[in-house]
Regions:
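Bacterial N-terminal signal peptides that target proteins for export
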Residues: 1-7
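Alpha/beta-hydrolase-fold serine-hydrolase catalytic core, especially in secreted/extracellular enzymes
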Residues: 141-151, 263-363
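Acidic glycine-/aspartate-rich tracts in secreted/extracellular proteins
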Residues: 51-52, 67-69, 99-102, 106, ...
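Cell-envelope and extracellular/periplasmic
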Residues: 64-69, 168-174, 186-193, 197-198, ...
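A domain-start/cap signature at the N-terminus of enzymes
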Residues: 20-60, 73-92, 155, 181-208, ...
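The feature captures the conserved acid-bearing segment of alpha/beta-hydrolase catalytic domains
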Residues: 87, 205-295, 299-308
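Bacterial N-terminal signal peptides
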Residues: 8-15
């Protein structure tokens, strides 16, 4: 049986963003903010839609970058203009920056290593066994970890605490509907989204994991039932969707395992159906849904031809988000300046993300 959902956007009554895009679209630039947490000054960037009015409350999305990426580079290079979709749907966007350090084996071979503490890394094994192969590629160990072991590569800073403080600050400073905080991210940012949604599910209305999942044994069932969207490329060798070892020799939970843990003992968990929306119908993407008809469905979409990049993008501009905007260049001067995204470009992954959050607003 196939479930067909007709999702309608908030600002455009057509299924695809191309129907309401224009060559002269203009949006507000992002603003930079700082927050002190656990003795560290952390930065984040906020986008407000043009229609923003302090007399109204707006839904907000926390979006986290991937390994090596930046907050502003992810918006410009990875998603290639997610703020254009936030403008059309009327969402506040919040892009936090992870901690980072200079990695490299010599002074002339240095690079910025950014990462999120998505499982308190620094060990070789997880609850279900090894999380990397014997010959896995070695990553630079974040200095705060002390020792990372063979399989460790992610930050050991208190990112869960930072994100909780971030939500509190955003709620205090902006007209946010606190019942409609959503969290998402790409790659390592998706992994961190999984963790914060599990550790603080009461703060969110929905979750989307794009191109990233936690290691085996770290899947969870959130205390508060939340809708979940997963989008992964069928040819993604960095974070394979089927749980096999990555090209670098690291293991990540399969999308099926994440779904099973997320839904837990719910009887609806075993009732998995094909799923299609107006956006996915015209794309080469295959989706299923578990717990359809509830307020916490789990939609799992596989993009057969996709690799480790934002769904719908060609990847010609890169998918890492290493660059920074002018706004972030002072804090990360080693990074190149991003090329401004094309406001008329269309990406089904971005459209589906906002449709999902608009349709499934949690409890």
């Amino acid at each position: 049986m196939k479930i067909r959902i007709g999702l309608i956007t908030a600002f455009c009554l057509a299924p695809l963003i191309s129907s309401c895009a224009s060559d002269d679209i203009e949006i507000k630039p992002m603003s930079r903010f700082e927050l002190e947490h656990d003795g560290l000054i952390r930065e984040y960037f906020v986008f407000l839609p043009t229609a923003y009015d302090t007399n109204n409350d707006y839904p907000a999305i926390i979006f986290m970058h991937g390994y090596g990426g930046t907050a502003t580079g992810t918006e410009a290079e990875v998603t290639q203009g997610l703020n254009f979709y936030a403008e059309k749907f009327g969402y506040i966007m919040v892009y936090p920056q992870s901690t980072w350090f200079m990695a490299g084996d010599s002074p002339d071979r240095q690079w910025v290593a950014t990462s999120w503490n998505h499982i308190s890394d620094g060990f070789d094994k997880g609850p279900d066994g090894p999380i990397c192969t014997e010959d896995a590629a070695q990553y630079a160990c974040p200095p705060e970890c002390g020792s990372c072991g063979k399989c460790g590569w992610a930050s050991c800073n208190d990112d869960v605490g930072f994100l909780k403080s971030l939500l509190a600050s955003v709620s205090a400073d902006f007209a946010v509907d606190e019942s409609r905080f959503f969290v998402t991210g790409f790659s390592n940012g998706a992994m961190m989204s999984h963790r914060i949604a599990c550790d603080a599910s009461e703060l969110f209305a929905g979750v989307a994991l794009v191109g990233g999942r936690v290691e085996p044994g770290f899947e969870c069932m959130p205390t508060k039932a939340l809708p979940l969207l997963q989008i992964n490329g069928g040819k993604d060798n960095a974070v394979p969707h089927d749980g096999k070892a990555s090209e670098g020799g690291y293991f990540f939970a399969s999308t099926t395992s994440v779904t099973q843990h997320w839904t837990g003992s719910d009887a609806c968990a075993t009732d998995v159906k094909d799923w299609v929306s107006q956006t996915t119908e015209g794309e080469n993407v295959q989706c299923t849904i578990a717990c359809a008809g509830t307020d916490h469905p789990v939609i799992d979409c596989i993009w057969p031809d996709g690799n480790h990049r934002w769904p719908g993008t060609s990847g010609f501009r890169g998918s890492n988000g290493y660059c920074v905007s002018e706004l972030q260049s002072a804090s990360m001067p080693e990074q190149t300046i991003c090329i401004a995204p094309d406001p008329t470009a269309e990406f089904w992954g971005s459209q589906l993300l906002f449709e999902f959050f608009d349709e499934y607003r949690g409890n």
